[in-house]
Amino acid sequence: MAMTTIAILLAGPAYAANPFLDTPNDKPISAKFRGTEWSEDIGDKDIPLTARVVTTRVAKMPWGAIIKIEYTDLKSSAEKQREIRPDYFIVTDNRIVLLNEEDNDAAAKKISAMDKPPEFEPNDIYGITSGTFEHQEVLWKTTIKLKGELCIYEATHPSGHFRKIVWKKGVGLVENASGYGARADGYRLKREVTSQKR
């Protein structure tokens, strides 16, 4: 009995899955997203935009995981097709943190070899599992709130720049929106709801 207790204590804390962003394995999970985009080139009206969002766990550590979210098959009637860069998130049991490096692939490999999570910059926190979170960096104001099954990240700037990410428990990303200036350029994508047979 004493040996078992010692082994458990020496093992340290194990990663408990984050309810808002988790994958069962390393296989990509794909979902359809639908929304709108706008820009000065498009004109006054928003136009429909669709995308396939692929979520893949690229690393798993005893203390968390690194998950890549890619935006593929973006389609709209715009002359210039939109590109959305992939996002990498460091996921612990209580945080979702944007990996914001010049070379995210190299950074993901380095972080995945660490014994514990790195120190997180407050402006890179994109999800929480309890309470609320507020952060101000120069003119950018970030709030993260929990509302029922949702974790809502919103960052705004007085110039009109914004970013909104919505996570849903047991699902993952359900909304991604980003805009620059007073409607100079931006998009809003929401996950399509599919009926599930039980």
Regions found by a protein language model. Name each.
Residues A2-A11:
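Bacterial N-terminal signal peptides
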Residues G12-A16:
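Sec/Tat signal peptide C-region and signal peptidase I cleavage site
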Residues A17-R198:
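Conserved functional acidic sites
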